[in-house]
């Protein structure tokens, strides 16, 4: 398939990557795109952290990240893992390590399934306000120090067959990268590639990469450039997508979707996190909605509904609400609710079932493209349920919990 053909293809073709196991969850192009989040409890609060992780898992989270800013926090991860195991919860855990984190990472690697490091902070020198440039020798000297500091962690993760996320943040690039490449996607990519090349030299390949920024255009550019750079150098590591510091409410969700969905539609991305300034479990439905909207994972009913107009023969918003309340537990179905017969039958043709205004007070029920029966509007929702039951696709809500 040519690039032009791919541009107009209705199927998303994912960038081919290797598989990286994070605990029991595979990340890579041959597997469903994994959904993850991060608790906001203090890691030293063992009970609170365990409760937060379980809330995320109950919401559908598949990988959970936990902050580990000190050795004490790293050791607490062992207790958290044990408490979760005792409760029958074996969700993969990721430790988040930042400033000068070698000792922390070496400790926490014993207790988790993946370690996330930030290349801009892993070997951290306080910026010098009087510095005018970085010479090649100064740049190389810090690179040598990074390798010496990073190598023990890579070897430990390799021995334990655990995973690493090289997680670049646009807002925390190292001073030498800023001087050399500027505050740019190129600087983000080179920051990650420095660590990728060290891992490759040490024959360690359980790597996932992220290139997060708080502005979607920067994030989009960085991920695209990262994928291209890896392709050029022969690397095929999976990508973790996210827009960092997206905020809250509708705008936070829209901002995250603008970045994440755009890349997913281009075939980039193997695991995602929507970062909201809200309870972490509220991030999870947004992730699944993004994936379903692109046809990448189907975990809920797909509702197709017109926006309503003067031709609409019933209160579309109220009816859609009633249909959703009655059927939202039927995962995997497509149900269309259309206001009239002008566009309804054609626009809902791909749906499993259709509920269409046929005339004043009358609705028609469809199975695919076939009209099955007409019923009074007041009986419409129950008649839809009956049709689904006749086809053997109905389950009671309690059975899906």
UniProtKB/Swiss-Prot annotation:
PANTHER family: 4-HYDROXY-3-METHYLBUT-2-EN-1-YL DIPHOSPHATE SYNTHASE (PTHR30454), 4-HYDROXY-3-METHYLBUT-2-EN-1-YL DIPHOSPHATE SYNTHASE (FERREDOXIN), CHLOROPLASTIC (PTHR30454:SF0). The keyword Iron applies. Its cofactor is [4Fe-4S] cluster. This is 4-hydroxy-3-methylbut-2-en-1-yl diphosphate synthase (ferredoxin). It is an enzyme of class 1 (oxidoreductase). [4Fe-4S] cluster binds at residues 306, 309, 340, 347. It catalyses: (2E)-4-hydroxy-3-methylbut-2-enyl diphosphate + 2 oxidized [2Fe-2S]-[ferredoxin] + H2O = 2-C-methyl-D-erythritol 2,4-cyclic diphosphate + 2 reduced [2Fe-2S]-[ferredoxin] + H(+). It comes from Synechococcus sp. (strain CC9902). Pathway: Isoprenoid biosynthesis; isopentenyl diphosphate biosynthesis via DXP pathway; isopentenyl diphosphate from 1-deoxy-D-xylulose 5-phosphate: step 5/6. One of its GO terms (molecular function) is 4 iron, 4 sulfur cluster binding.
């Amino acid at each position: 398939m040519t690039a032009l053909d791919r541009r107009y293809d209705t199927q998303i073709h994912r960038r081919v990557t290797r598989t990286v196991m994070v605990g029991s969850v595979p990340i890579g192009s041959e597997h469903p795109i994994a959904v993850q989040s991060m608790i906001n409890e203090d890691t030293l609060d063992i009970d609170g952290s365990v409760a937060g992780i379980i809330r995320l898992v109950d919401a559908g989270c598949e990988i959970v990240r936990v902050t580990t800013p000190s050795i004490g926090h790293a050791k607490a991860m062992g207790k958290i893992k044990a408490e979760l195991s005792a409760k029958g919860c074996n969700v993969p855990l990721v430790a988040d390590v930042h400033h000068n984190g070698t000792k922390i990472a070496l400790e926490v690697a014993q207790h988790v399934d993946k370690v996330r490091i930030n290349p801009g902070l892993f070997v951290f020198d306080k910026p010098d306000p009087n510095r005018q440039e970085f010479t090649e020798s100064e740049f190389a000297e810090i690179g040598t120090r990074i390798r010496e500091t990073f190598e023990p962690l890579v070897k430990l993760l390799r021995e334990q067959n655990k995973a690493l996320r090289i997680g670049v943040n646009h807002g925390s690039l190292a001073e030498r990268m800023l001087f050399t490449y500027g505050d740019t996607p190129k600087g983000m990519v080179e920051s990650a590639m420095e660590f990728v090349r060290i891992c490759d030299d040490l024959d360690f390949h359980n790597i996932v990469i992220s290139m997060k920024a708080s502005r979607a255009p920067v994030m989009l550019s960085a991920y695209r450039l990262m994928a291209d750079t890896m392709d050029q150098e022969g690397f095929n590591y999976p990508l973790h997508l996210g827009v960092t510091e997206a905020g809250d409410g509708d705008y936070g969700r829209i901002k995250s979707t603008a970045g994440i969905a755009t890349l997913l539609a281009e075939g980039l991305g193997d695991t995602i996190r929507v970062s909201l300034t809200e309870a972490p479990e509220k991030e999870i439905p947004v992730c699944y909605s993004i994936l379903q909207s692109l046809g990448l994972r189907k975990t809920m009913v797909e509702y197709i509904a017109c926006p309503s107009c003067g031709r609409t023969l019933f209160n579309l918003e109220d009816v859609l609400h009633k249909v959703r309340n009655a059927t939202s537990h039927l995962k995997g179905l497509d149900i269309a609710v259309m206001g009239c017969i002008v566009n309804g039958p054609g626009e809902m043709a791909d749906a499993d079932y259709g509920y269409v205004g046929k005339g004043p007070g009358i609705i028609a029920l469809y199975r695919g493209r076939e009209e099955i029966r007409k019923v009074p509007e007041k009986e419409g929702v129950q008649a839809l349920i009956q049709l689904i039951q006749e086809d053997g696709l109905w389950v009671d809500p309690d059975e899906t919990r």
